[in-house]
């Protein structure tokens, strides 16, 4: 059922980030006269016909509100969200509203989620469909904001590819016609309140589908295999048996990216794309920034920027992608209580001469290394910041080898996000 919003519906938008701005703009285009913004400060660019209320004014913020649209980063446990629930005010998100409207219009929506791999997979799907001359639009975290294009897609009816974070799948009430789930491992536990709530939010992409829909899932992922089926749709596993395409000229590196390519073909082929279309994309697409991104040769060393790796499992995948080329590893960041044992095993098995660790989480990875192999722990060094890590790697790494920056942790309090962290790493490397 589509959420009804009329010109006189009292709608509050909570948060003024990228999606919040998009929601405010969309409400204005709808002609909604009762829209208000709830945020910590009044934005300087807020239109005068949009009322503003401080987020800490719980009573005033929700007074008379019939629908609350929240930004994806706002936790379900936020006092204002809890107050809205207690008052019986429906809460949704810009992405959920977009998927609802696409469904009502009978549009094909491919939703892509997963603890890692969703951005690359969504991009591969969109590029493969485009290679097959199938009208396509990519929206979400790596494309345009979904509500920014809702009128265009209803009018022109392309296949819609939307990348969905766990924050966005959490609010879905209607699932996409095709759901793609890449991997499942612990992430964002502070936001979701634990592993199982996080997994449940991720899998909501399938739980909200209908019987006529399709769920494409990675059969090599143990957490997904343990939980399948995830909803009423037809389930299509990928990853087992031979691939239906050639990866001979594939620019993306690593077994995980070959799995992403399999997922992309499964989804794109539903709409008529062929293996040859994917093969052409794989031969030309080098990958997205901050995802095992090759920065080139500096000081006789190849530098790889994998700032997207905010969990140990992602760093292990990056190590697997480069095999014996990596002789120096840089990792660490915010300590979220992750189990670093799998990453420590991956580092010890490669017998790397240089492991450089960043605070505050670096010591936790160091402890995991020491527990496995005291000699490996003795070779690891904890530095003060990223600049020191890059300088030390440039001095210690064997010439002709590869330096991998794959933090296995977020960087709260130091960088705004993984993009800013990756940009800083790139700048430091290019300044050597």
Per-range role (PLM):
Residues 46-48, 341-401:
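C-terminal helical cap/extension that packs against the catalytic core
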Residues 47-57, 88-89, 107, 178, ...:
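Active-site regions of enzymes building and remodeling cell-envelope glycoconjugates
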Residues 60-61, 72-219, 223-232, 426-432:
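Phosphate-binding loop of NTP-binding sites
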């Amino acid at each position: 059922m589509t959420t009804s919003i009329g010109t006189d519906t009292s709608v509050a938008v909570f948060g003024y980030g990228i999606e919040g701005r998009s929601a405010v703009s969309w409400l204005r285009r709808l002609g909604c006269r009762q829209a208000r913004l709830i945020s910590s400060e009044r934005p300087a660019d807020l239109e005068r016909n949009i009322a503003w209320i401080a987020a800490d004014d719980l009573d005033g913020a929700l007074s008379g509100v019939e629908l609350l649209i929240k930004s994806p980063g706002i936790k379900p446990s936020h006092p204002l969200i809890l107050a809205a629930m207690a008052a019986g005010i429906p809460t949704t998100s810009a992405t959920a509203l977009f998927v609802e409207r696409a469904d009502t219009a009978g549009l094909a929506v491919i939703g892509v989620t997963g603890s890692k791999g969703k951005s690359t997979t969504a991009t591969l799907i969109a590029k493969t469909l485009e290679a097959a001359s199938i009208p396509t639009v990519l929206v979400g975290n790596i494309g345009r904001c979904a509500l920014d294009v809702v009128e265009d897609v209803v009018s022109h009816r392309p296949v819609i590819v939307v990348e969905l974070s766990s924050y966005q799948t959490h609010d879905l009430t209607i699932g996409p016609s095709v759901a793609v789930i890449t991997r499942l491992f612990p992430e964002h536990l502070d936001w979701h309140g634990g592993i199982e709530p996080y997994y449940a939010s991720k899998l909501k992409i399938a739980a909200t589908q209908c019987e006529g829909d399709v769920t494409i899932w990675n059969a090599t992922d143990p957490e997904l295999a343990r939980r399948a089926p995830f909803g009423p749709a037809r389930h299509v596993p990928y990853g087992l048996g031979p691939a239906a395409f050639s990866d001979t000229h594939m620019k993306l590196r690593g077994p995980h990216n070959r799995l992403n390519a399999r997922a992309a073909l499964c989804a794109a082929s539903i709409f008529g794309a062929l293996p040859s279309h994917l093969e052409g994309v794989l031969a030309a697409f080098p990958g997205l920034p901050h995802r095992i991104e090759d920065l080139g040769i500096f000081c006789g060393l190849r530098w790889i920027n994998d700032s997207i790796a905010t969990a140990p499992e992602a760093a292990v995948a990056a190590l697997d992608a480069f095999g014996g080329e990596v002789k120096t590893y840089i990792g660490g960041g915010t300590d979220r209580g992750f189990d670093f044992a799998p990453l420590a095993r991956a580092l010890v098995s490669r017998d790397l001469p240089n492991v450089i660790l960043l605070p505050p989480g670096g010591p936790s990875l160091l402890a995991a290394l020491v527990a496995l192999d005291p000699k490996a722990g003795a070779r690891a060094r904890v530095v003060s910041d990223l600049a020191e890590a890059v300088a030390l790697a440039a001095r210690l790494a064997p010439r002709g080898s590869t330096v991998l920056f794959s933090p296995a942790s977020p960087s709260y309090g130091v960088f705004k996000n993984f993009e800013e962290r990756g940009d800083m790493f790139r700048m430091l490397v290019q300044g050597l």
